[in-house]
Amino acid sequence: MPDILTASQMRALETAAFNSGAVTGLELMERAGQSVIDALFSSKAELATGEHRAVILCGPGNNGGDGFVIARLLFVLGWQVRVYLYADPEKMPRDAHANHDSWVDLVPECTQRISFPSVLPAEAERFGDEAFGNGEVDVIVDALFGIGLNRPLSGLHPILATCHANRHEAYFVAVDVPSGLGENGPLEAADWSVFPADLTVTFHRPKQAHQNGLSFCGKIMVQYIGL
């Protein structure tokens, strides 16, 4: 097994684990979400106790499903959590959809849909006001897109630009890889087109995207999830 994995190699590992019966997709998603929280608390010990506030950006795939697990687990720990969903939940993969439903059933009033595939400027302004307006947000989690992304995120430009404009107002955490970073580097030339991570939490092994975009990843922590 190579020390650095491509997206296709990681997916092959996951598929082999599912096919062997070693783990289900839901179990793996739960482990991934918990491992992000473990890494967050290891990196920022002051967040492990007390009341804090998180904003979670969830995308249309399994990375978004990880985000819903993170939201639920932080809420259970006593955090104030707001989710922004960049997806049609009915079109999400089965396991991601299940975790969406678990979150919405738990806290129905704390999820805000944003237009997919193109975020409206007014929605980005609302996101900025709610996430950064009162200066109390502690953590922004990027669970929009994971490894293997191969197209620019032009529809998300207003959200990404808002994150960059408030770069020092919160601790920015990327799940697996910062959104907007492809396997060979940024998918667009502008620095603000990639989520500005302070911490990137990836699973099993470092990924090729990290090596080609180190300046966007912040601190990289590899978490083992039983593959």
UniProtKB/Swiss-Prot annotation:
K(+) binds at residues 63, 142, 179. GO terms for molecular function: metal ion binding; NAD(P)HX epimerase activity; nucleotide binding. PROSITE patterns: YJEF_N. It comes from the Bacteria. Disulfide bonds: none annotated. Belongs to the NnrE/AIBP family. This is NAD(P)H-hydrate epimerase. The lineage of its organism: Bacteria, Pseudomonadati, Pseudomonadota, Alphaproteobacteria, Rhodobacterales.
